[in-house]
């Protein structure tokens, strides 16, 4: 599946330092240690509606990881999926009288446009579930053959009893797991399961639903194994960083990690990064609640994508936050102030700004601190001036390359 057009990256003098990020599994900030090529997987959208700011905030976060790694001299193998077959997609297609394939294609196109406008570096591999059904079913069969899965009325379930490390990502107790599993797409009440926490690997064909031939019979994949199979295929086991929104910690990432351990004997990733939820009207933005601010709608209203990006960068990726009417005016004012400073013929030395932005982003992607460093330079430039004629160009390149904001 094609991704979207890549932004050009302006080279910076020197190189950045190693990236440290908060690892969900250990609860600690850890130094990432990729080799020459870093490997990263981010869970993608289910394309039954346009991308909202919660999605954009997640992919902005992984874009910062990508930029910091590149600045430190690493090539980056970035893989992102799109869940182009799933129950919510089928339900929306039926409710609106649209073929599910057409709905998915339409919303994926809008997503691509949004990501390109926000200057998100595209994945090395942008992979749909539909195009990956064979490798997903093969992984499910591989897990079945280890004895870790069982059949129930033609469906294939992973037996949580066969995953001794289960809980290593989320660190939740069983009661919390059961509650979240039921809220987030699981079926803990299904009769016949060995354990309420057992999860679906392969769903046997149902009348009126799409299905594919496989070694497991005709059907379609369960949710969690889709990402496990795509990540294993494109990144191999034990890659550098796996993640997504914090609502994916459990069950999605916990169950995916168990599937990979079962199939390979090791972890799926060395680090697990999760992004705080963006709220509106006191609730997290979600398609099911309908309390959404769409990136595409903001663009249609004439909002500069650089301003949208700056509004999100003002928030640390791990902290939940609320979108309010004050976000865009504040980001617009910041962009105008920066542009005014960048238009000066000379300004204060920019080398400390580059160093400060690098240091902030390398330490758990502290984008608010990075913005503050540029703010301080711009304020000094506008009030006191400066003598360095090359400073505006270096700050412009710093903001462009590390923060992804083109002014």
Swiss-Prot record:
Ligand binding (Zn(2+)): 43, 227, 252
A GO cellular component entry from the record: cytosol
InterPro entries associated with the record: Cys-tRNA/MSH_ligase (IPR024909), Mycothiol_ligase_MshC (IPR017812), Rossmann-like_a/b/a_fold (IPR014729), tRNA-synt_1_cat_dom (IPR032678)
Gene Ontology molecular function terms on file: ATP binding; cysteine-glucosaminylinositol ligase activity; cysteine-tRNA ligase activity; zinc ion binding
Ligase is among the record's keywords: yes
Motif ('ERGGDP' region): 183-188
Region (Disordered): 1-22
Binding sites annotated in the UniProt record for L-cysteinyl-5'-AMP: 43-46, 58, 81-83, 223, 245-247, 278
Coiled coil regions, renumbered to chain: none
Cofactors demanded by this protein: Zn(2+)
Cofactor note: Binds 1 zinc ion per subunit.
Motif ('KMSKS' region): 284-288
A Pfam short name: tRNA-synt_1e
General function of this protein: Catalyzes the ATP-dependent condensation of GlcN-Ins and L-cysteine to form L-Cys-GlcN-Ins.
Family classification: Belongs to the class-I aminoacyl-tRNA synthetase family. MshC subfamily.
EC number(s) from the headed UniProt entry: 6.3.1.13
Gene name as annotated: mshC
CDD domains referenced in this protein's UniProt entry, alphabetically: CysRS_core
Catalytic reaction(s) noted: 1D-myo-inositol 2-amino-2-deoxy-alpha-D-glucopyranoside + L-cysteine + ATP = 1D-myo-inositol 2-(L-cysteinylamino)-2-deoxy-alpha-D-glucopyranoside + AMP + diphosphate + H(+)
Quaternary structure annotation from Swiss-Prot or TrEMBL: Monomer.
Protein name per UniProt: L-cysteine:1D-myo-inositol 2-amino-2-deoxy-alpha-D-glucopyranoside ligase
Motif 'HIGH' region mapped to chain: 45-55
Entry's Gene Ontology BP terms: cysteinyl-tRNA aminoacylation; mycothiol biosynthetic process
Keywords for this protein: ATP-binding, Ligase, Metal-binding, Nucleotide-binding, Zinc
